């Protein structure tokens, strides 16, 4: 398409919105993530001589267009919702304002990055919520769909609330805690289980989590772990973090039995960690069964988002700038499916909170130049079923614009926070959700509505089309 615009001398400034239509996992919310990597992509976006030589070899591109690519740099504006923010369907996560050749080029990369990390961050937030304050460790690198999915998926999982990751490279690159234990192969490589435990404890007395299910969890694994813990205590070694890990079997039953054995031996502060194909539903079930587990290693189902392996982000044209007046002319994509009809214009997103408790009442999509007085009544409209409207009385709500400038005239103006700072922000964001919106079964939906003015423009565009 870029060459098509180039050869037709058509390169107007346009507005594109990146958004999604449905939350994953039947959730009521999603978590925005991936902005840092999107920024890095835009900053480094260029075509090398090697790139151009390859494109030339395809025999699809003319020389004048290839020459243009050699000097290509992104020159537009980008606005986005910061990472860690709770977000909802149909509202723009990223808005690109740029010449159409530039705006069109960045589509695939932006969606790839934001879709993936938003998916994993959302899944992680659900798993963390299910654990009810217990620590969740991200253990999925070996099951991720490739190295990058493991690396950046672990980053997203940290944003969603995990206390650490087994991916050492993620720890190095993003300064997040690295956590892990030994494998069954460690046990099997020694003459016996006790020796394996003893050698591991000698190496890592302050991170001594022993995997007890290689042979017989209750018959040998837990007893041998207790033996090693006693020897550590007798030697005057006080561990800051020690315990056992269960990776198979009936985790509820085994954890309760193991807890009693540890407590009877005087190790009431020993941790019981569990892994084994965990997700938010199994963790919830185990906690409801009274499982004596306080630390969870979650791998495959988290890093692959197994029950919803794709985040349905899309990228749609919303406005074209009039070259004479400089005004943005709203554009709309129609569909027989009402949910796929886009919202036109150069827009932003406002979050409306209940003034009394700080919980989210609704999100409001509005034109970028709109402003709202919290002390005045506000009428908002459903973007799909536009005959549905809600009146918010002045003084009962507060307003916060949640989109921020990231690039202006091709220059990055946004300072990316550290991942652990994003995680802390995400935790605060999740606390603005109503309890009813966080349950896993039939959660209460948070409404995303249109401003009065945007509603009128959308209605006019729809009416104009139907009059043709």
Language-model region placement:
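Buried, small/hydrophobic-residue-enriched core segments of structured protein domains
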Residues: 1-13, 22-24, 60, 66-75, ...
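An N-terminal, globular interaction/scaffold subdomain
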Residues: 40-44, 80-83, 87
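A residue-level signal for beta-strand positions that form part of recognition/binding surfaces
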Residues: 15-17, 75, 136, 314, ...
């Amino acid at each position: 398409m870029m060459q098509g615009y180039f050869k037709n001398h058509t390169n107007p400034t346009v507005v594109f919105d990146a958004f999604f239509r449905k939350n994953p996992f039947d959730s009521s919310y999603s978590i925005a993530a991936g902005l840092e990597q999107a920024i890095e992509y835009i900053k480094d976006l260029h075509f090398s001589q090697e790139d151009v030589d390859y494109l030339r070899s395809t025999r699809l591109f003319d020389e004048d267009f290839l020459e243009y690519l050699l000097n290509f740099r992104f020159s537009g504006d980008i606005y986005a919702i910061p990472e860690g923010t709770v977000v909802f369907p149909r509202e723009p996560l990223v808005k690109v304002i740029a010449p159409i050749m530039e705006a069109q080029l960045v589509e695939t990369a932006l969606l790839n990055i934001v879709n993936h990390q938003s998916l994993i961050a959302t899944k992680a937030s659900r798993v963390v919520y299910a654990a009810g304050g217990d620590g969740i460790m991200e253990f999925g690198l070996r099951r991720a769909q490739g190295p990058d999915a493991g690396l950046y998926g672990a980053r997203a999982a940290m944003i969603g609330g995990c206390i650490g990751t087994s991916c050492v490279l993620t720890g190095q690159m993003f300064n997040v805690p690295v956590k892990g234990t030994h494998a069954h192969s460690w046990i099997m490589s020694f003459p016996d289980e006790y020796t394996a435990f003893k050698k591991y404890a000698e190496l890592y007395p302050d991170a001594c989590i022993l995997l007890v299910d290689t042979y017989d969890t209750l018959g040998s694994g837990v007893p041998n772990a207790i033996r090693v813990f006693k020897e550590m205590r007798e030697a005057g070694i006080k561990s800051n973090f020690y315990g056992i890990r269960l990776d198979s079997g009936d985790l509820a039953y085994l954890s309760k039995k193991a807890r009693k054995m540890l407590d009877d031996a005087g190790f009431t502060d020993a941790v019981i960690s569990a892994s084994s194909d965990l997700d938010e539903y199994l963790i919830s079930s185990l906690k409801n069964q009274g499982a004596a587990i306080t630390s969870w290693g979650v791998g495959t189902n988290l890093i692959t988002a197994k029950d919803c392996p794709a985040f349905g982000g899309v990228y749609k044209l919303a406005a074209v700038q009039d070259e004479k007046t400089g005004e943005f002319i709203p554009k709309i994509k129609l569909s027989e499916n009402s949910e796929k009809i886009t919202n036109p214009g150069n827009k932003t997103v406002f979050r409306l909170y209940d003034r009394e408790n700080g919980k989210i009442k609704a999100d409001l999509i509005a034109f970028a130049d709109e402003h709202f007085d919290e002390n005045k009544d506000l009428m908002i409209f459903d973007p799909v079923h536009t005959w549905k409207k809600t009146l918010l009385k002045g003084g009962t709500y507060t307003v916060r614009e949640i989109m921020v400038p990231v690039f202006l005239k091709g220059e990055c103006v946004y300072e990316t926070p550290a991942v652990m700072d994003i995680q802390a922000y995400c935790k605060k964001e999740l606390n603005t959700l109503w309890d009813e919106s966080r349950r896993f079964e039939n959660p209460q939906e948070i409404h995303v509505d249109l401003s009065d003015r945007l509603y009128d423009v959308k209605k006019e565009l729809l009416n104009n089309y139907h009059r043709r």
